[in-house]
């Protein structure tokens, strides 16, 4: 049909021929298309053209008006028949026998078949009907089938449908709850990982502080020695220009003091200060074997070469309030009791001398003995004060080291 339509198409308007006219060169065009060609020619030329060229072959054709051209009745009739065929519905064809129209109705199987199916196929011994008779028969059968559809009980289907939709909602709700659980699990895991990361990085900061404390002390000592050495060199340069004997001798004394300090200053060995020897073998790949539920076990390696430490971290954390309170009490006792009492002993001795003189005016010897006793007691208490200060300092240093070591 498409190939036929190409032959029935006007070359100018590319549509099916409408009142086709044939030129002397045998080419066909629509009447209205030729009118347009002639009108265009008359506009472009100052005088009336005596001929025009065929739009297809460019052959000259005498101008005698489109109405004077011969109508191609044969082509016009073919176009009209083609339009009727094109508008009419197409007859279905057989799927098993290509291009064979389904023009026979098998009354046995109640289906359309082609001639080949009726003679050679599985329908060979079936009962056949014409298309018209089959149409009437199936039309009456439609009413019977429609009544069966109306009488069909759909309540059971609706019941099953409601059950399925209810089960679907329950399943989706259950999946949503499980999805929320999974989301909460990973959010918790993410929180634990972030918390553990911050804890381990905090441990690294503690190690950095320990390294800085270990190295900075020795570095500062060496800087001090170098500074004193530069000062000593400056003193030597100044001594070369001093002519005053007294000033020279005074500067020489300062120079000898600095030289003594420089020579007696202890020099470090320059070796590495390993704060945590276990960190030498530290590798994050050792955490790969830890399960998700055991994220809390992630930690930096601990130094096992030091003194034995308490193993229960919870016990250490529980002692934190007690240690803090003990330190506060010790400081309070030290500063509120020791210092005011001991520092006031000399004044107390003088007051005691006055009181003794008042009560023992008749016995000067007893007063002198009493004053001597309290002077000796004051000396002993002053010695006790110094020792207490030393013990308190040592105790506070040990407490600070303990707190830093176990991160209380």
Curated annotation (Swiss-Prot):
Q: How does it sit in the membrane?
A: Single-pass membrane protein
Q: Which GO terms describe its cellular component?
A: endoplasmic reticulum membrane
Keyword set includes Zinc: yes
Positions annotated as zinc finger (B box-type): 89-131
Q: Name one GO molecular function term.
A: ligase activity
Which GO biological process categories is it annotated with?
protein ubiquitination
Gene3D superfamilies assigned: Classic Zinc Finger (3.30.160.60), Zinc/RING finger domain, C3HC4 (zinc finger) (3.30.40.10)
Locations listed in the record = Endoplasmic reticulum membrane
Q: In which pathway does it act?
A: Protein modification; protein ubiquitination
Write down the Pfam families for this protein, in alphabetical order.
zf-B_box (PF00643), zf-RING_UBOX (PF13445)
Keyword annotations of the record: Endoplasmic reticulum, Ligase, Membrane, Metal-binding, Transmembrane, Transmembrane helix, Ubl conjugation pathway, Zinc, Zinc-finger
Q: Where are the zinc fingers (RING-type)?
A: 10-58
Q: Which residues bind Zn(2+)?
A: 94, 97, 117, 123
Domain comment from the record reads as follows: The C-terminal transmembrane domain is indispensable for the localization to the ER.
> What does the record give as the function of this protein?
E3 ubiquitin ligase involved in the retrotranslocation and turnover of membrane and secretory proteins from the ER through a set of processes named ER-associated degradation (ERAD). This process acts on misfolded proteins as well as in the regulated degradation of correctly folded proteins.
Official protein name in the record: Tripartite motif containing 13
- Supply the source organism for this entry: Xenopus tropicalis
Lineage, broadest ranks:
Eukaryota, Metazoa, Chordata, Craniata, Vertebrata
Gene for this chain: trim13
